[in-house]
Regions:
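Non-catalytic terminal and connector segments of soluble metabolic enzymes
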Residues: 1-120
Length: 120
């Protein structure tokens, strides 16, 4: 995690909030509910509830696009050299990072993990 956090700072993101969590299966199912009908849902929620995760709220100009560019393609084998997923991902299922894809998604995801915390 330290190497990813170092890249976060190097790339100009500010960490507005951070939590180390260990999601229950139910937490993972709630967080990834948009994928409930997908064939990978069970494996995804099993994996996400298997070990602790570091959840971050990042801030930067055009943060969503900037973060998604830094993460790289979902499949580490197809991710650009220098991206987090290329460097730290092991497979499409274990790709090291997650990122919101739109402001509405970010609002849900931040609310899911940082309930009651005022974030702009």
């Amino acid at each position: 995690m330290g190497k990813i956090l170092a890249r976060v700072e190097t790339e100009g993101f500010a960490v507005r909030a951070a939590r180390m969590i260990h999601m229950s299966k139910s937490d993972a199912q709630g967080f990834y509910h948009v994928h409930a009908a997908r064939p990978f849902f069970g494996a995804l929620t099993d994996f996400m509830s298997s070990d602790p995760c570091l959840v971050l709220c990042l801030e930067a100009p055009d943060a969503i696009k900037k973060w998604r560019d830094l993460m790289g393609a979902t499949d580490p084998a197809k991710a650009a050299v220098g991206s987090l997923r290329k460097e730290f991902g092991r497979s499409i299922d274990h790709n090291a990072t997650h990122g919101s894809d739109a402001p509405e998604t970010a609002a849900f995801e931040l609310g899911y993990f940082f309930r009651g915390l005022e974030l702009r």
